A protein has these predicted regions:
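A short glycine-rich, Lys/Arg-flanked "PGG" loop and its adjoining helix->strand segment in the class I
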Residues: 131-145
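S-adenosyl-L-methionine
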Residues: 1-43, 51-60, 79-106
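Conserved glycine-rich SAM-binding loop
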Residues: 48
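Conserved SAM/SAH-binding beta-strand->alpha-helix loop
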Residues: 71
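Class I S-adenosyl-L-methionine
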Residues: 158, 164, 169-224
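Conserved beta-strand signature within the Rossmann-like core of class I S-adenosyl-L-methionine
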Residues: 146-153
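Conserved beta-strand/loop positions that form the S-adenosyl-L-methionine
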Residues: 45, 68
Length: 224
């Protein structure tokens, strides 16, 4: 579903400009200057309208959260949400997952959130999946050993495919569940997730921890 174009997009973006990092490459290796006492730096890939972003940042004020979003009409809503909440530990970047090594130095990111990404269901689209081996190798370039990927999806086929793909690229799976909110809600939800929960849709979730791994000569995720 395409998001409607937001009215007055540019003025709204300018009103939240203090939260937008215009040149993320200039902060590569220096992100913690934005929050010197931060105990962790985390990245959210595709923040959408920012419910998860704002609530996570509010719950953990000593965590520096960088929300990466390529759709301006979504990002402006997320920025307005964060600004209205008076948050000082969250910043926004116009970009996507492929840019992470350009934005962040090796080992600079402690955790990556991937929430309800596009499943790209056709076989010829699999390289676009954010849990594809090509992306996993990019994440390895910015995470330290022990760094984590937190992955949530309502798409069962994508989740099962990802459970097979992720360990092949040097990540250890844990906290695997196919019904995260069984009984009662668990953790911070995204906007979509809250709707899914109300509709009775089950949510899949896992944590992937980076471990030592030696890439094959031509490592590439090729599971269909």
């Amino acid at each position: 579903m395409r998001m409607r174009k937001k009215k007055n997009l540019l003025p709204r973006m300018e009103a939240c400009s203090s939260l937008l990092v215009a040149d993320p490459r200039a902060l590569r290796g220096r992100w913690r200057e934005l929050l010197p006492d931060a105990r962790e730096l985390r990245v959210e890939l595709g923040c959408g309208k920012g419910r998860f972003t704002a609530e996570t940042a509010a719950a953990e004020p000593d965590v520096l959260l960088i929300a990466v979003e390529k759709v301006p009409d979504a990002m402006v809503v997320a920025m307005e949400r964060a600004q209205a909440a008076g948050l000082h530990n969250v910043f926004f970047v116009d970009g996507d997952a492929a840019c992470l090594p350009e934005f962040f130095a090796p080992g600079e990111v402690d955790r990556i959130y991937i929430n309800f990404c596009d499943p790209w269901p056709r076989s010829n689209q699999k390289k676009r999946r954010l849990t594809h081996g090509n992306f996993l190798q990019l994440y390895r370039r910015v995470l330290p050993l022990g760094g984590e990927i937190h992955f949530k999806s309502d798409n069962d086929k994508l989740f099962e495919w990802s459970l097979d793909e992720i360990p092949r690229f040097g990540f250890r799976l844990s906290q695997v569940t196919r019904d995260l909110h069984a009984g009662s809600p668990v953790g911070v939800m995204t906007d979509y997730e809250a709707k899914f929960y109300q509709q009775g849709v089950t949510i899949n979730r896992c944590v992937a921890t980076m471990v030592p791994w030696e890439a094959p000569a031509e490592a590439e995720g090729e599971k269909a």
